[in-house]
Swiss-Prot record:
Lineage: Eukaryota, Sar, Alveolata, Ciliophora, Intramacronucleata
Gene source species: Tetrahymena thermophila (strain SB210)
Effect seen on changing K532A: Slightly decreased transcriptase activity
Protein name from the UniProt record: Telomerase reverse transcriptase
Effect of F854A: Slightly decreased transcriptase activity
Effect seen on changing W433A: Slightly decreased transcriptase activity
Amino acid sequence: MQKINNINNNKQMLTRKEDLLTVLKQISALKYVSNLYEFLLATEKIVQTSELDTQFQEFLTTTIIASEQNLVENYKQKYNQPNFSQLTIKQVIDDSIILLGNKQNYVQQIGTTTIGFYVEYENINLSRQTLYSSNFRNLLNIFGEEDFKYFLIDFLVFTKVEQNGYLQVAGVCLNQYFSVQVKQKKWYKNNFNMNGKATSNNNQNNANLSNEKKQENQYIYPEIQRSQIFYCNHMGREPGVFKSSFFNYSEIKKGFQFKVIQEKLQGRQFINSDKIKPDHPQTIIKKTLLKEYQSKNFSCQEERDLFLEFTEKIVQNFHNINFNYLLKKFCKLPENYQSLKSQVKQIVQSENKANQQSCENLFNSLYDTEISYKQITNFLRQIIQNCVPNQLLGKKNFKVFLEKLYEFVQMKRFENQKVLDYICFMDVFDVEWFVDLKNQKFTQKRKYISDKRKILGDLIVFIINKIVIPVLRYNFYITEKHKEGSQIFYYRKPIWKLVSKLTIVKLEEENLEKVEEKLIPEDSFQKYPQGKLRIIPKKGSFRPIMTFLRKDKQKNIKLNLNQILMDSQLVFRNLKDMLGQKIGYSVFDNKQISEKFAQFIEKWKNKGRPQLYYVTLDIKKCYDSIDQMKLLNFFNQSDLIQDTYFINKYLLFQRNKRPLLQIQQTNNLNSAMEIEEEKINKKPFKMDNINFPYYFNLKERQIAYSLYDDDDQILQKGFKEIQSDDRPFIVINQDKPRCITKDIIHNHLKHISQYNVISFNKVKFRQKRGIPQGLNISGVLCSFYFGKLEEEYTQFLKNAEQVNGSINLLMRLTDDYLFISDSQQNALNLIVQLQNCANNNGFMFNDQKITTNFQFPQEDYNLEHFKISVQNECQWIGKSIDMNTLEIKSIQKQTQQEINQTINVAISIKNLKSQLKNKLRSLFLNQLIDYFNPNINSFEGLCRQLYHHSKATVMKFYPFMTKLFQIDLKKSKQYSVQYGKENTNENFLKDILYYTVEDVCKILCYLQFEDEINSNIKEIFKNLYSWIMWDIIVSYLKKKKQFKGYLNKLLQKIRKSRFFYLKEGCKSLQLILSQQKYQLNKKELEAIEFIDLNNLIQDIKTLIPKISAKSNQQNTN
């Protein structure tokens, strides 16, 4: 463990001291790397440095050039005494572009191009602006015209823009080194060999076998299109499938061919079109199937013919299925269906508004008619058995497929099955119609299995995509429910038709009105695609969801509405930093919340920690409460938005944390080599293959900037993460900027607020008030609107701070307000002022979500209609704030069942170890990263919360562990996890846990407590978290009956090796327990069934002398 810590410390030390010049010298592709000053001395372009001014000399020493060849001698032979250029710098640059030809260069030509709504400006480019500077003009005079032209072509030129940041202004694009994005393991395999020796002839068969494994692993199986089953409103008169489905494809194709033939033969009277017949339906099926399902996977013509015979049987069997009978048998309508139908009809035909209570009861009755997973599975199994011959997959494989259907039906919204989830449980030798392979070598048999698995994957996808999914889409409406997470529910289409009719009535009564397309302005109608409305069942009502992801093919609009608003979103992203400082009190993320909260804590401590009062409020339906005309007026009058913006894409090449190998060797520090050898099983490293992906990470981002922004402001807007990092980085400005004006954004907002049309069941609606919630600019617009409103009504807070010296903190995250102050009167005045703001601007506060920590007479302030809740602990947006210490902790109210319904387990058997490791790390960081702030919470407070964060992490990780233990390793040896010499889930889970904890602690300690935390506290944190995490994992798995036999053996091993994660850090653990910085109470131990803290402490005390003696003996040896 100490060895790993030393490696990490050396790694951090090296990355902090290095600069870009040192890093580029390690790139094997660059044969020459130097600063510009040394290059000019080597080429004898300059001799006396005293003639150069200080600013230009600094420019030469900080500018780095690099090339794939050493061209110093070439530049010595030309223009030893160059004449001063008579051309402008712009003309020389344009000439260099002509010389460059087809090569990629960052110097752009001048011109404008109109694209859609926008205009591209090729001459406004950060790299080009830098080349137009006086420094490059002086450089042109030193080189001469011809040399300077070739200099821009031959060299990569990086100019310094920040302390450790550079801008590439010329040369070939660095992005070419990242053109092939390969995974790290694959990159290592290409750059390391076994002891530096070539493969011998004796091992040729093994080499062929490994190549076949690579081909099999690299093969991409077709996808199961499960996402298509959701939200299909289409309903036919009779149960079955769509007319455009595979089974009706031959009839459609037949009619289409007759139509084409008639059009071609129009005017040719000498040909009788009645005698011309289209292809036979079986011929059409053959043509389409062989194109769609990769006929190249079939090994011979015999297999192709057999496959087509099976499909013809499937089509014939499908047309003979009685869907009415199967639906009545497995998924019948409720007995009171006719009664529900008559009630809905009565409400729809009624001219008066429907009774609220009767509508709620009717909605609940309709929602209660959902079909269970078991009923749906039995219905699908019966169709597959009647339609598909079991010989197509093999009898045993067919049984496996039917069993897997239940998993397909009950999966959550964003989960999907992989073809490998079926294949790894199937046997290709069970398929009798495959051409058999007898008396062949092992390598040929393996290739046979690999090829047949590909065919088996095509067959599985064919059955699911062409039979299962169309049947579900046509006969059922599949959706989520409100407050049910990602769990899905099935409804019969006749039931959902009643729900839709009742929904249209309620929509007209609320914030939507029917609209005709004739009333929409032609400009807005032609340019913007329409959105789509769907509903999610909610108790007694529904929740409308507007989506803007579809494109309008009829109007030839190739972009959806969110894509059209992408540039406007970039402009509004700049407002996030200004809102809350110049207008209102908006916050957008946990980073802004933490910064404001930390500033308030510092003021509170400086004032002597006075008593605090808080208020939380919630705006009711904030998006629907926005006044559309006021929003447009606020936008036009605001000086925060400039008249013109340029949209450009920047690339960031940021130095990663991998150490420089050459520096490690010269300083006799082998830590970097140790890290690399551990990752590649001690295979020697090829120094000649180090390239940019080894030392740099690539990021890209689009930003919006105005003409008044300087270079530093542009970089800060695009890459905020580089401000807090001291590693070297390179910024590249490659694209041609495009322009967007304030008038264009105004037209977008006008369409959104006044002419935005959405469709529901072929009925067009328009919002009476407010803006849609599903757009990419809705959140910023909402915060901007309410920020302008609250600015007028909160002026008294600024006056109170100046007059009384009170300290106040007011934040609003979209619609949730939080106010903390040392003055109770300020809190009361805020409630009154915000209520006045709501009354004057047509919105309301949710009267059941107002909380304070003090009581007051509501009648005196005209607030008697509010149901104010008094709580000593402030709870706001999932955070709990202790008003005595102002420490923040998370609120975990979800049960394990609710979490299981929310978490989507979208992982495959392939690369399972890395997927689970990354998932566990992200889950824990999401739980703790926002609270690991030394300016807000103390380390002792974090230790007290550690158990709760660990428990919440494991509860969310539990569905993934269930997926792990469901894998049948006996039937799936190829996809089992290799851990040393054993294939066990126990060691696999230990491996995931150990390295995840290592990464998490390194990230947290390095980023937040770098200056004040020491190695002992880091060890305490890591070992304590490991101990709690592992025990909770086992306790949860122990409760599952299907793992009982396995876990009994596992628990025995764990009890014997209880101190697996404590041996190296038990001294630190005993220290923290003796100082009482962290203790588990009885409530915290309820979830851990077999742990006794007192016994554990005694065990640690008895174990320490043994470990100490053993370690001393090892040191002596």
